[in-house]
């Protein structure tokens, strides 16, 4: 795959290759000219189905066995992807929401949320950042969450894992500044599945809307993307609330 340091990405690696946001983004980028897609996830029928759907859109799709919870395997899984040719875009999308009520009483389940969303992402993010720097160009898109801006009582386990991921991604972006590699942090609100009641439009979004925002952010060269855009102002206000008031606020 030839180097394409500017313009729409022609080759991409999706970490979380069965995620709705990852696949929606891949579909949009294929429509804009992407020709090679690596889908990285645990082997499953869902992964093969996703690969088939993207292949039908005209892309060459390669599946990559990847387990976020096994960082010692990341080099063996992802190294060959970069060795095979330049990757213009890496989308780091894997993660789990967990179940707050259950996880509070089952600490090992809470640890699994943290390990998947944060430590797994640290290992994969550093590996991909170094590989992009080695090739001299590329963009790493990291899916954070508005939940990481200020963890709520209702989801502080998940929120704290995303807070760590967000801080890591920002720091990695600073570390890679000037190398030809860019890190873009995406902070969606609550992502709704098809058929789910929408609720407050300032706080919710869909996989398709997140994908569209990612595409726009890539074109603009953005470092941070909020989805929906108005969420930035909402969360800025939430961040500054005194704790006694924040405890009573349902957001």
UniProtKB/Swiss-Prot annotation:
Q: Which InterPro entries match?
A: NAD(P)-bd_dom_sf, Sc_DH/Rdtase_CS, SDR_fam
The active site annotation covers 158 (proton acceptor)
Sites binding NADP(+) sit at 14-37
User: Is Oxidoreductase among the key words of this record?
Assistant: yes
Q: Name one GO biological process term.
A: antibiotic biosynthetic process
Q: Which UniProt keywords are given for this protein, alphabetically ordered?
A: Antibiotic biosynthesis, Oxidoreductase
Checking SUPFAM superfamilies in the record gives: NAD(P)-binding Rossmann-fold domains (SSF51735)
Its Enzyme Commission number(s) read: 1.-.-.-
* Family classification: Belongs to the short-chain dehydrogenases/reductases (SDR) family.
Purpose of the protein: May be involved in the biosynthesis of a heptaene-type antibiotic.
**Name of the featured protein:** Uncharacterized oxidoreductase in mprA 5'region
User: Which organism is the protein's source?
Assistant: Streptomyces coelicolor
Record lineage? Bacteria, Bacillati, Actinomycetota, Actinomycetes, Kitasatosporales
């Amino acid at each position: 795959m030839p180097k394409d340091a500017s313009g729409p990405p022609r080759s991409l690696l999706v970490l979380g290759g069965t995620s709705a946001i990852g696949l929606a983004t891949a579909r949009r980028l294929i429509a804009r000219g992407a020709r090679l897609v690596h889908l990285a996830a645990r082997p499953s029928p869902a992964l093969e189905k996703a690969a088939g759907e993207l292949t039908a859109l005209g892309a060459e799709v390669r599946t990559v066995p990847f387990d976020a919870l096994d960082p010692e395997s990341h080099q063996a899984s992802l190294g060959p992807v970069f060795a095979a040719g330049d990757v213009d875009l890496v989308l780091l999308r894997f993660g789990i929401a967990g179940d707050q009520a259950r996880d509070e009483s089952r600490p090992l389940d809470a640890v699994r949320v943290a390990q998947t969303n944060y430590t797994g992402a640290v290992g994969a993010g550093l590996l991909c950042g170094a590989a992009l720097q080695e090739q001299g160009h590329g963009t790493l898109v990291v899916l954070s969450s508005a939940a990481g801006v200020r963890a709520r009582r209702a989801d502080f386990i998940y929120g704290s894992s995303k807070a760590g991921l967000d801080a890591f991604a920002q720091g990695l972006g600073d570390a890679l500044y000037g190398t030809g590699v860019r890190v873009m942090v995406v902070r969606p609100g609550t992502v709704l599945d098809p058929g789910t009641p929408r609720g407050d439009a300032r706080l919710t979004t869909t996989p398709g809307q997140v994908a569209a925002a990612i595409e726009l952010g890539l074109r603009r060269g953005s470092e941070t993307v909020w989805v929906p855009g108005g969420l930035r102002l909402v969360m800025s206000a939430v961040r500054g609330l005194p704790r006694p008031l924040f405890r009573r606020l349902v957001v």
